[in-house]
């Protein structure tokens, strides 16, 4: 009898604990759903497609890397790759656009090319701005372009640069991880 009472008490206690957990979860659902709804409405669902389209329209002229160099873009740091998550490619940076401290969808600071022997294929762009310059002129808020918030690359960083904000847009090569993710596993530096 003692054994049965102990087992019954144990089962009742476990049941009460499970019911308490369930009650807490049910009570939190409205708050979790509200956070989810805010997160979903914080970005315009058309923005990714719109930003990719705008970038393609403004960079079509740079499909030929020679047009990029004629427009003031030049290779910076060689082909950037990661050990287990693809690559970024070769960044052709326009230092004049970087130095102006502004962001303009029609004038990305960097064009990203994938090397193929002595040729280059345009795969995306990177918008860049010095963080101190941007924050001083924009009420200490990070840049946002068509609903996409830029990432801060702090110092020290692998490029030995002062802190900067950046946003990749894979407009010319699909990225399974997303159009605005830094690394693209469909881009490679092996073709150099």
What is the predicted role of each segment?
Residues 21-31:
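Bacterial N-terminal signal peptides
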Residues 40-192:
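Primary mode marks residue(s) on the alpha4-beta5-alpha5 output face of response regulator receiver
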Residues 34-39:
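Boundary at the C-terminal end of the N-terminal hydrophobic targeting segment
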Residues 10, 21, 110-112:
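Functionally constrained cores in energy, signaling, and assembly domains
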Residues 1-17:
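N-terminal secretory signal peptides that target proteins for export/translocation
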Residues 2-5, 30, 75, 149:
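Intrinsic disorder/low-structure terminal segments
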């Amino acid at each position: 009898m003692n054994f049965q009472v102990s087992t019954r008490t144990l089962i009742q206690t476990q049941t009460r604990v499970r019911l308490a957990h369930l009650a807490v979860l049910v009570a939190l659902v409205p708050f979790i759903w509200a956070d989810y709804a805010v997160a979903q409405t914080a970005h315009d669902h058309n923005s990714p497609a719109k930003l990719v389209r705008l970038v393609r329209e403004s960079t079509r002229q740079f499909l030929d890397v020679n047009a990029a160099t004629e427009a003031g873009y030049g290779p910076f740091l060689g082909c950037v790759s990661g050990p287990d998550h693809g690559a970024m490619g070769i960044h052709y940076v326009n230092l004049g656009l970087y130095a102006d401290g502004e962001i303009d969808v029609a004038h990305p600071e960097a064009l990203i090319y994938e090397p193929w022997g002595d040729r280059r294929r345009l795969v995306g762009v990177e918008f860049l701005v010095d963080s101190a310059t941007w924050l001083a002129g924009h009420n200490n808020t990070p840049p946002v372009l068509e609903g996409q918030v830029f990432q801060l690359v702090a110092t020290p960083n692998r490029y030995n640069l002062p802190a900067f904000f950046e946003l990749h847009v894979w407009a010319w090569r699909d990225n399974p991880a997303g159009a605005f993710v830094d690394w693209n596993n469909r881009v490679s530096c092996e073709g150099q």
